Amino acid sequence: MKQIFIGIIRFYQKFISPMTPPTCRFYPTCSHYGLEAFQKHGTFKGFWLTCKRILKCHPFHPGGFDPVPDKKDDKVNS
């Protein structure tokens, strides 16, 4: 499932994005953010993080540097 989403993002980057002017207000761009989110966090959390990022991409948000959060270790150290 993760590979399907990564394939969709890569298709967008290769065929759709070059036809539009660069307008992303974030670094890394939303598509690069999505790729990294899926690679770091897997399907479900990657999808959630990517959706949150795309919803922030509007003229009223200042944008800027917004990296993918690091994966939290689920183990509790005692």
Curated annotation (Swiss-Prot):
Chief localisation class: membrane
Domain of life: Bacteria
Family statement drawn from the similarity comment of this UniProt entry: Belongs to the UPF0161 family.
Localization per Swiss-Prot or TrEMBL: Cell membrane
Entry GO CC: plasma membrane
Name listed for the protein in its UniProt record: Putative membrane protein insertion efficiency factor
InterPro entries given in the database record: Membr_insert_effic_factor_YidD (IPR002696)
